Amino acid sequence: MMETERLVLPPLDPLNLPLRALEVGCTGRWELLNVPGPPESTLPHGLPPCAPDLCQEAEQLFLSSPAWLPLHGVEHSARKWQRKTDPWSLLAAVETPVPSDLQAQRHPTTGHILGYKEVLLENTNLSATTSLSLRRPPGPASQSLWGNPTQYPFWPGGMDEPSITDLHTREEAEEEIDFEKDLLTVPPGFKKGVDFAPKDHPAPVPGLLSLSRLLEPLDLSGGDEDEGEAAGGPRGDNASPSPSGTPLVRASSLEDLVLKEAATVVSTPEPPKPPPQEQWAVPVDVTSPVGDFYRLIPQPAFQWAFEPDVFQKQAILHLEQHDSVFVAAHTSAGKTVVAEYAIALAQKHMTRTIYTSPIKALSNQKFRDFRNTFGDVGLLTGDVQLHPEASCLIMTTEILRSMLYSGSDVIRDLEWVIFDEVHYINDAERGVVWEEVLIMLPEHVSIILLSATVPNALEFADWIGRLKRRQIYVISTVARPVPLEHYLFTGNSPKTQGELFLLLDSRGAFHTQGYYAAVEAKKERMSKHAQTFGAKQPTHQGGPAQDRGVYLSLLASLRTRAQLPVVVFTFSRGRCDEQASGLTSLDLTTSSEKSEIHLFLQRCLARLRGSDRQLPQVLHMSELLRRGLGVHHSGILPILKEIVEMLFSRGLVKVLFATETFAMGVNMPARTVVFDSMRKHDGSTFRDLLPGEYVQMAGRAGRRGLDPTGTVILLCKGRVPEMADLHRMMMGKPSQLQSQFRLTYTMILNLLRVDALRVEDMMKRSFSEFPSRKDSKAHEQALADLTKRLGALEEPDVTGQLADLPEYYSWAEELTETQNMIQRRIMESVNGLKSLSVGRVVVVKNEEHHNALGVILQVSSNSTSRVFTTLVLCDKPVVSDNPRDKGPATPDVPHPDDLIGFKLFLPEGPCEHTVAKLQPGDVAAISTKVLRVNGEKISEDFSKRQQPKFRKDPPLAAVTTAVQELLRLAQSYPAGPPTLDPINDLQLKDVAVVEGGLRARKLEELIRGAQCVHSPRFPAQYVKLRERMQIQKEMERLRFLLSDQSLLLLPEYHQRVEVLRTLGYVDEAGTVKLAGRVACAMSSHELLLTELMFDNALSALRPEEIAALLSGLVCQSPGDPGDQLPSTLKQGVERVKAVAKRIGEVQVACGLNQTVEEFVGELNFGLVEVVYEWARGMPFSELAGLSGTPEGLVVRCIQRLAEMCRSLRGAARLVGEPVLGAKMETAATLLRRDIVFAASLYTQ
C-alpha cells in the first residue's frame, strides 16, 4: 500500500467532476451539489476508512494504463553508437591452403630444368592442433623451438598409423569383414552398448552358392527330371555337400572361377611352419679388424688425428647406412667418437642432431667440447638457451620429452638423437623419461645409444628394435683400453705406507694371497696394540684424526710411485669436506702451477660481484686449489665445481675428493682412483657397492695414451672386508638395465588430449612390458591355429542323459582347483609343515605316482623349500602294451569316485616300493596316521639296493614292515585315509580356506547328483568336451595376453584417471578439460600447482611471497620453515599443505597406494625464508646464516624454482590470468641474479 501511495497517478478526466444530484421537493426540480465525500450520516465522524482491493488497484495501475511505467521511458531505450566503417574489409579473404604446386621437370643426366608441371597436394587442411602428421604445416616461428602445450606431438615411430593406402586396401577387402563379429556395439563415450545377440536360436548361416554349378551345361533331355528334383528332391538349402567334400570359398572375382583339373593324388597337408623369429637386436663382431673401412667410406664426414678402434669403425659404418646403434663400451673407451661422427654426418646432410645427457653439468661440458670441434652447436637447459638454430643441440632428456609432447618443429629436421649414459635409465626417479622419449620419437629419427657395459644390452636393444620396428646394431667392447689393477691399502702412518696389496691384476685374476696378506697386516698391528699402527677399534671407520693419518700415508706412497692425480670417492658430502680440510698441511703444486691456478681463479671469479667473491666456500676452495686439492659434490657452488673440473682436466688438481656424481659421464680420467669405503647409503639403508657402481667409478682410473695401467685402491681403515664381498663387487656382473617406467599425471594428460594416442599403447611399449609382449606375434599365430583347430573339432553330444555334461565338467575343474588351493595353503602354513614329520603317512600325487600312499622318512631343507624323503608304494615294473599295466596314471575321464576323496592306488600285482624326494607340491593330503619307522636305515638300505651289485638283495625287515603297513592302510581305506582337517586340526583361519572348504562340499554334492556319468557314452563325450574346453581356455589366455587387461600398470592407470576425473581435469568421456590442459604445461607437481592456481591461492600474494611458497615443491633438503616467517607466508604454507592433503585424500579414495602423509611429506619448506629474502634482494653471503643447507643445494633449489615460475607464467597465460602471469614473470626476474645464475664457464 505504501508503494501505491508513492506512485504518481495520472490526471483525472475533465468531465469526471465531483458532483452529486439532489431532488428538491416533489416538483421534479434537481440541484447539483459539489460536496465530495460519502453520503451524509448521523455518525459523528462518518464511515471508517477501508483498504482498497489490491487486485483491482494493480489491474488499474499496471494493466489498464501502463504508459506511466519507467520501462516505457524513451531515455531507457537502446542506444546506437556510430561505428567506423571500413569498406576495404569486404575485399579481405581468409587464406586457404593452396591445393597444388609447381614441380620442376629436370633432365635425368644433366639436371637442367626442362619445364614445370602442376601437382596436387595432399593433407592441405592439417594443423598442429588437429594432426600428428609430419605433413602438417609448421607452426609460428615463436613456437618452432619449444612447441606449444596445445599442439599435438608427431606420430611416434613403430605405432600403426592408418594411411590412405591402408584405407583403400580395407575398402577393397571389405568382403573379408565379418559383419556379425567385427562390428562395434558400444558408441564412443558410452559405457554400455546394444546387445544384438539373438534371444532364442541363431539364424542359420546362408551357404555360398556355387557359380560353377550354375554354369554347368544344361541337359535339355533331362529337364523334367531336374524339375522333379527341384520340387521334391534333396536339392535345396539343406542339400548335402558335393561328393568332393570341399567347402565352397568366396571368390574375389569371376576370373578366379576357372575350371581346374581334378588332382589325381591327394597330398596330405603339411604342418604349418612356425613364424620366423624376428631379430631386432643384431650383435656386431668387433674382434676382427675392418680392413675395407676407407674403401667403403672414401670421404668420411669427420676425421680424427688418431686411428679409430674397431668398434668405432663398425659403428661409423652403420651410421653411414642410417642404422640405429647401441654402443656399450667400457669407461674411457671412446664412445664420444660415435657421437662426433653422427654430428658431422648431420651437418653434411644439412639435418639436425640432438645430444641428450642425464645431468646439466654434462650438457655444459659437451657443449664446450662439441663447440670447439664443430662450431655450429647450441645448448638448451632449464635456464640457458644458446644458439637454438644450430645443427647440433645439446639438452637434457627432460627437455627433449617436453619438445616431443609439445610438437616442436625441430623434430622435423631431426636425423639423429644421441642418448648418452643410457644406463641412467635405472634411476628410479628419472628413468621413466628415457622410456617416454624413446617411445615418442618419430619414425624418421635414428637412435644412437651410448652406455657403459651392461649384461643385457641385447635385450634392451631388442626392445627398442621391436618398439621402432627397425634393427638395432649392438656394438660392445671386449676389454678396457687401459687395464686396471685393484689394491687393498691397510696403512695409516709413514711406517705403514707401503702396505699396498694387489687383489685383482690387469688380466682379471683374483689374488687370494694379496687378500690374506692384508688380513695378516691388520692382525699384526692389532696384536702389538701400538697407537702409531692404527686405531684401537679396528672394526670402526675412525674419526678425522685417523682419516688424516691414512690419507697422509697413502698420498706419500702415491707421490713416490708417481701415481697422481688421484680421485678419492667418498659417499658423504660432509666427509669430503672434512678429509680435504684435514690435508691443508700438504702442498702438492709447484710455484708455476700455483701461479697458473691463481690467474685462472681470478679470471673465473671476476664474473661474480664483490660480496660473492668473499663467500667462505669460495675462499676455502681457492686455498685448497692452490695446494692441489679439490672437492666436488652437490653442496659446492656450480661455478666452483666447474673451476675444479677444469683445473683437474689440466692436471693442476692432484687430489680430488668427490662423491659418486663425479663418475657420471664427466670425462675426467685420473691416474689413480681411491675408494674411502665400499659401503654407501642409498637413501634407505647402508649397503655394499653394486658391481656396476664400482666399475663406473673405478673406470675413471687410467688415462688413455698416458698410463699403461690404472690403479684402483680400496682403503681398509677398519677391518678388511670379506673376500666374498670383494670378489662380488670387483668381478660381479654390472646391474642390468631395468625399466623404471611409471605412470605420471603429465603423461596421462598429454596422451589423453590426443585422440589418436592411448595411454595403454604407451604402457604396452614400455620396457617393463617387454618380457610379456615380445611374443605377441607367436601368440597371434597360436591363437589363429587354435581357432582353426577348434573349428575342426566335433561338437560333443549334450542331449538326453548327457544334458548336464558341461556343468559336470565345470564342477570337476572347480573342485580340483579348490582342493589344490586348500592343499597349497596347508603346505605353506607353519602347522602344516610341522605335521610332516618322520613317520607321517601322506598321499602322493605327481607325474610318477597317482594317489599312492607313502610314509615320510626324512625331512631336509634347501635354499628355497623343504624336501621330504618318502617311502612310496608302487607297482612292479613290467613290460606290456596294456596302459593299465604300466603303473598308476591319472584317469582320463574323472568319475565321481575319482573326484570325491582319494581313490588310493592299489598294486595289481606284487607290491613294490620306492624312495622319492618329494616337494611340498607333491603331497596331495596329510593323513592322521603315523607309523613308527627308522627312516635313516630304510633310506640307506634302498640306496644300497639300487647298486647293480646289491640289486637282488632282499629288503630289510624295517622296509618290509613299513610297506605292509602302507598296503594294509590302502586296502582298509580305498577312498582315502582320514586326513587332517585344515581348520580344526591345523588351525588355519584363512578366509579363503574356510570358504574353499564349504565350496568343495557343495561341489561334491553336485557331482554325486550328476546324471551324465550313468550314460554309456559319457567317456567319449567327456573327452570331446574336455578337448574343446581346454582349447577355449588356452584361447582365452592368449587373448588376455594380447589385450590391454594384461598390462601390469592398468589398474593404477584407471585409478589415476579416476583422480583426474574427480578433480575435474577430465570429463566422463576422458576429454581433457581446461584444468587438465593447464596441468600439461607443468614440469612437476602438476596437480598441486594447478589446484593452487584454480583456488586463487597465489594471485593475492606478492611475487617474492609466491616464490618462497613454491620453494617447498622443489627443495630437496628437508627442514622446518622456522618461526621467523611473516604471517602471510605461514598462512600460505598451511594453505599449500591443505591443498596437498586434499589431493592426497582423493588419491587414497581412488585406490592409489600412496598415503596422504607420504604425499604431503614430499613438500619441504626448509628454504622458504632463504628464498624469500633472496627474492627481496638480500646478498648471497648473508643467506648462509638463515639456513644450514649447503650453498650448492640452495643454488639448485633457486634454479629449479625459476624454471617452475616460467611454467606457471605460461599456464597463467593459457588460463587468461594476466595478473598472475605478470607476477610469475616478476618472481623469475627477482630470482635470476648474481652467483645463483652466473653463466657457466663451459659456455664462455
Swiss-Prot record:
Which residues does ATP bind? A329, H330, T331, S332, A333, G334, K335, T336
Give the primary localization class.
nucleus
Is this entry keyworded ATP-binding? yes
Residues bearing PTM Phosphoserine: S242, S253
Q: Which UniProt keywords apply?
A: ATP-binding, Cytoplasm, Helicase, Hydrolase, Nucleotide-binding, Nucleus, Phosphoprotein, RNA-binding
Question: Locate the Helicase C-terminal domain: which residues?
Answer: 582-752
Q: Which GO terms describe its cellular component?
A: nucleus; Ski complex
In residue numbers, the region (Disordered) covers: 218-249
Location in or out of the cell: Nucleus; Cytoplasm
- Report any one BP term from Gene Ontology: rescue of stalled ribosome
Task: Name the chemical reaction catalysed here.
Answer: ATP + H2O = ADP + phosphate + H(+)
Q: Taking every annotated instance into account, which residue ranges of this chain make up the domain Helicase ATP-binding?
A: 316-472
* Motif segment (DEVH box): 420-423
Top enzyme category: hydrolase
Primary role: Helicase component of the SKI complex, a multiprotein complex that assists the RNA-degrading exosome during the mRNA decay and quality-control pathways. The SKI complex catalyzes mRNA extraction from 80S ribosomal complexes in the 3'-5' direction and channels mRNA to the cytosolic exosome for degradation. SKI-mediated extraction of mRNA from stalled ribosomes allow binding of the Pelota-HBS1L complex and subsequent ribosome disassembly by ABCE1 for ribosome recycling. In the nucleus, the SKI complex associates with transcriptionally active genes in a manner dependent on PAF1 complex (PAF1C).
Subunit architecture: Component of the SKI complex which consists of SKIC2, SKIC3 and SKIC8. Interacts with HBS1L isoform 2.
Q: What is this protein called?
A: Superkiller complex protein 2
Q: What is the native source organism of this protein?
A: Mus musculus (Mouse)
